[in-house]
Amino acid sequence: DWNEPLFRWDHLLVAALSELRSSGSLDFTPPAWPRHGRKGSIAVAAGAPFVVVEGTGAGMRAVADLIDVCIWVQTDDDAAEERGIRRDTEEGTNGDAEESVRFWHWWMAGERAFFAADRPWERAHLIVSGERLPGLADNEIAWAEGPI
């Protein structure tokens, strides 16, 4: 329950987004959070003009009818791995550098299996490059209408 096997938490995302759609607000605590000592909840106040659900699983097939727009950020695997390991090491999120590398290799193996089965980019309305492309200023991004 957001501590389940990678990308097998679609039922939680469906439950949260369904509640948000029907009631206009959300205060959701994934069932596993208290068991793992995680406090708080995922809260969206009534009247929020939009909600961003972030992550590689945010556009999964199971929620396609519950989201209005899907944006796919296309990034080279090596660049994503390097950024993730650097960020997690700097923040201490997944331990030291060695533990972060181990986590990221585990994560990327699960992510690749999810991508092969679900192909979320095929439902994307907009594709954004996750890498700086030649000729763009620092405040510019490259994008195209989806799907890929």
Predicted regions located by residue number:
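Flexible, active-site-adjacent loop/turn segments at secondary-structure boundaries
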Residues: 26, 31, 61, 112-113
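Conserved nucleotide-sensing/catalytic segment adjacent to the nucleotide-binding pocket
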Residues: 1-53
